[in-house]
Amino acid sequence: MDSKTTFLTFLLCIFIFSHFSPSTSKSLTEKPLSFSPSASLPTLTAERLIKGFNLMPTRDVNVIDEEGSEAPRLVERAFDLPAAVDRRGSGGSPSVQDFGHHAGYYKLPNSKAARMFYFFFESRTNKADPVVIWLTGGPGCSSELALFYENGPFTVSNNSSLSWNEFGWDKASNLIYVDQPVGTGFSYTSDQSDLRHDEDGVSNDLYDFLQAFFKEHPQFVKNDFYITGESYAGHYIPALASRVHRGNKNKEGTHINLKGFAIGNGLTNPEIQYGAYADYALDMNLITQSDHDNLNRYYATCQQSIKECSADGGEGDACASSYTVCNNIFQKIMDIAGNVNYYDVRKQCEGSLCYDFSNMENFLNQKSVRKALGVGDIEFVSCSTAVYEAMQMDWMRNLEVGIPALLQDGIKLLVYAGEYDLICNWLGNSKWVHEMEWSGQKEFVAAATVPFHVDNKEAGLMKNYGSLTFLKVHDAGHMVPMDQPKAALQMLQNWMQGKLSTPTGRTAHQ
């Protein structure tokens, strides 16, 4: 197996692997981060960093104060990024200070030393807009890529200055980005036991964070709430939706007004989606019919290994084996296709990671920016190999299984996918959505496929029945809000407002 093949295995369906700069990509091949005393984050160093964060209380949060009450678990501050264009409203542009922009750390209660970092941007339009949380995949990649390159309030330029994103999702929502699982982005821990290994741990941490968030921001408790994200978040999102729904049913803490969840180019049902690789690659003329037939023989082995992983309860050697066996399918396609960009097959892969997102890394590692965000001396981590490896046994789990109960209770699901993405392609997503067994399956399968219009032009194809909507987005790859920002914003708005629901077959338009 050559180095390129090995590298592609590591990157399969990661949401942000492509944004490592040349200087950071080296870390992927180095020894993974260890939390032992002799490793790169020794306990004493971590303690120094923790005490240095200006978002943190003056004493460690585990210390009980004189009145006997615990120091706050969630510590947040408003921020004003120093490199924002027209940051004071000159030239008629909105001022950063005109909107509520917050960054904070949350100390996870079921951990020894874990802090979860997040951004919160109040709506530019109406504070009564829904609250939307965005989760990036990986596993172990930071949500800041989506913030600065896809659907956040700002875009970042070559000179590390910021400008307003005309199609930021904060135009339609109060928007949260979380660095999770712990160890991702600006989130951190000094204890290896805080790393999560499955969706139970991940979803419980996020649920605890949301409880603390709404306690900090009670004015948003009654707003509608939606969970969104991309790629490996096809695992995170259904798990969190189920956790929130269960918490609401059991009357755990604050009721979260969950209305729906949206998965973009996600990995949700690996058994079905890996079976779509050969078909999609053939449709895109990346492989020949003979290649396709050979790959389908590999898929039979992959399918069996996933079933064995499921029989083991998502643990053990069977899951490790299924990860290796199934990823051979993708590796073989890339060996045949050559230098194609696996996030957008219309393009060639430039450099080892196909895209260059180094502007974000350079910006977030500026001292002035870290000071504004209150993250002390921590270096921004784009993707964590330690988190990735900790979650590896979770990879082949089927997260579709919890979705039918959510649909049955009226919680909406939007599955959308850019048509030119290979790695988490629209075909595989369409297949699992159509094959999912739920009360409306027959009607959904029979529903008409209709155009999705933006500016009176067809921007995608969609179908809907009841709480379920599927949308194939034209002229987009893996990252739909980056490739088609206007269509992505309109998609979000229409979906939250019920305008993507077209049971009568009418087209969805603004």
Curated annotation (Swiss-Prot):
Gene3D superfamilies: alpha/beta hydrolase (3.40.50.1820). The keyword Glycoprotein applies. The active site is at S231, D421, H478. It is found in: Secreted. Keywords: Carboxypeptidase, Disulfide bond, Glycoprotein, Hydrolase, Protease, Secreted, Signal. It holds the Pfam family Peptidase_S10. Transmembrane segments: none annotated. Ubiquitous. InterPro entries: AB_hydrolase_fold, Peptidase_S10, Ser_caboxypep_his_AS, Ser_caboxypep_ser_AS. One of its GO terms (molecular function) is serine-type carboxypeptidase activity. Glycans are attached at N158, N159. Belongs to the peptidase S10 family. Probable carboxypeptidase. This is Serine carboxypeptidase-like 48. It comes from Arabidopsis thaliana.
